Amino acid sequence: MDLICMYVFKGEESFGESIDVYGDYLIVKVGTEFLAVPKKSIKSVEDGRIVIGEFDEEEARELGRKWLEEKSKPVTLEELKSYGFGEEGE
């Protein structure tokens, strides 16, 4: 089941938007922050919306920061070449 690009609600309240799945976590953009919400806290998924229950928000913020750092690392030329980029001019 695809959980990306869906509105996330905590109970009846709008919470954020899902942008990635990171292991056992759903990455949710909440304002300017990224939270790693445990997938086990998902209560339902239907009609383009995800409803979540309670979870440790401080831990979710910390894991969200780690996710952002990992996703923001620069890519080396060798990594680009391993994916087939940069070989056109050679």
Swiss-Prot record:
Matching entries from Pfam families are given as: DUF5749
Q: Gene3D superfamilies annotated for this entry?
A: 3.10.20.840
Q: Which cysteines are joined by disulfide bonds?
A: none
Please give the start and end residues of each transmembrane region.
Answer: none
Extent of the signal sequence: none
> What name does UniProt use for this protein?
Uncharacterized protein AF_2094
